[in-house]
């Protein structure tokens, strides 16, 4: 066999840089009620590998919404996690989470307020 065949067969692991997770109070409150430490670690590990996995929230200046399984439910009926990835600071802010059946989507005013909070942190 040719050497090039062996090179194609080798799969290198993806290198993940260090990332700091910052949990805001609304997220902490949700997590304490609905998730174990293992659930949080699963979310963090997922975001380390796929930090841009959630849908961008229109008008949210980079805020993202991720569907995530909660309390034995699948993603569709589970939780929504609102987060922000601050690329240059290598941080992911876990801002807010809610169970889909208990709350509707965020209002425009809430989105604007959260976007401003993240902008202030970036600028300050």
For each feature predicted by the language model, list its residue ranges.
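Residues that form generic nucleotide/phosphate-binding pockets
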Residues: 30, 46, 114-117
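A generic structural signal for short beta-strands and their flanking turns/coil linkers
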Residues: 23, 43, 60-64
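Arg/Lys-rich, positively charged N-terminal/basic patches that mediate binding to nucleic acids
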Residues: 1-38
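Compact soluble domain cores
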Residues: 26, 35-55
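Basic/aromatic recognition patch in beta-strand/loop cores that engages polyanionic ligands
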Residues: 54-97, 102
């Amino acid at each position: 066999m040719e050497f090039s065949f062996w090179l194609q067969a080798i799969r290198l692991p993806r290198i993940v840089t260090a990332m700091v997770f910052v949990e805001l109070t609304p997220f902490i409150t949700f997590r304490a009620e609905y998730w174990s430490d293992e659930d949080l670690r699963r979310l963090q590990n997922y975001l380390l590998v796929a930090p841009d996995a959630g849908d961008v929230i229109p008008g949210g200046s980079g805020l993202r919404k991720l569907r995530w399984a909660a309390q034995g439910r699948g993603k569709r009926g589970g939780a929504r996690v609102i987060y922000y990835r601050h690329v240059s600071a290598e941080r992911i802010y876990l801002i807010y989470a809610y169970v889909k059946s208990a709350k509707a989507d965020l209002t425009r005013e809430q989105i604007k307020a959260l976007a401003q909070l993240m902008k202030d942190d970036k600028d300050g």
